[in-house]
Regions:
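Hydrophobic transmembrane alpha-helices
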Residues: 1-2, 14-18, 33-44, 128-129
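Hydrophobic, aromatic-rich transmembrane alpha-helices
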Residues: 119-140, 144-151
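Hydrophobic alpha-helical membrane segments of integral membrane proteins
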Residues: 6-11, 24-32, 144, 161
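Periplasmic/ER-lumenal interhelical loops and adjacent helix-loop junctions
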Residues: 52-132, 162-174
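Membrane-interface helix caps and helix-loop-helix hairpins in membrane proteins
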Residues: 19-28, 110-111
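Perimembrane helix-loop-helix junctions
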Residues: 29-62, 134
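Membrane-interface alpha helices of multi-pass inner-membrane proteins
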Residues: 8-23, 59-66, 148, 152
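Short hydrophobic alpha-helices at membrane interfaces in multi-pass membrane enzymes
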Residues: 2-16, 47-58
């Protein structure tokens, strides 16, 4: 088995394990990020869109075959889930913009129980210094991923969530 096929097999294995874990939202986010990173790396190495889309199709076809034993129960579970009947307004709940203070301050405001956004001053400083100091495409890609992920956590308080909800496949479930 050549390098390209072993990479495809590895991708299928990672995605299948994620799917079999039974947390559909996590699987979906891993699949989105893995696909985006594959496209990024492929475009950086000069691969054509046809080549990239062909490899993505192969990986997801093999993934469907490997995970088919769990696919029907998972679809049934999703159809019975209460989340599928929730209105957009309920699904679009997210952080409020004031929660950004939690990056550097704990025990602040209405969500002071968990501090889900806390990074700390050192962590935030190192993250912000990494991109300009390295200046390579990979740093810019991961900074973009972090920004998109952060904006999506604000749910309906930011327009990007609305776009993702209506455009990305299966994103409307979460």
């Amino acid at each position: 088995i050549g390098g390209a096929w072993s990479a495809a097999a590895g991708s299928v294995a990672v995605l299948a394990v994620s799917f079999f874990a039974g947390h559909t939202q996590t699987f979906l986010l891993i699949a989105y990020l893995g696909t985006a990173y594959f496209v990024f790396r492929g475009r950086c190495s000069g691969r054509s869109w046809v080549w990239l889309l062909g490899r993505i199709a192969v990986v997801f076809t093999l993934l469907m075959l490997v995970s088919s034993v769990q696919l029907i129960p998972q679809v049934q579970f999703l159809s019975l889930s209460t989340r599928t009947r929730l209105p957009f307004e309920e699904l679009a709940r997210g952080f409020v913009l004031q929660d950004l203070v939690q990056f550097v301050v704990t025990k602040f405001g209405r969500t002071d129980l968990w501090q889900p956004l806390y990074i700390g001053i050192l962590g935030l400083t190192l993250a912000l210094l990494a991109t300009p100091l390295r200046g390579d495409a990979a740093s810019r890609f991961w900074l973009s991923v972090a920004i998109v992920a952060l904006v999506l956590t604000f749910g309906g308080n930011m327009a990007l969530y609305n776009v993702a909800y209506w455009i990305l496949p299966l994103f409307y479930l979460f």
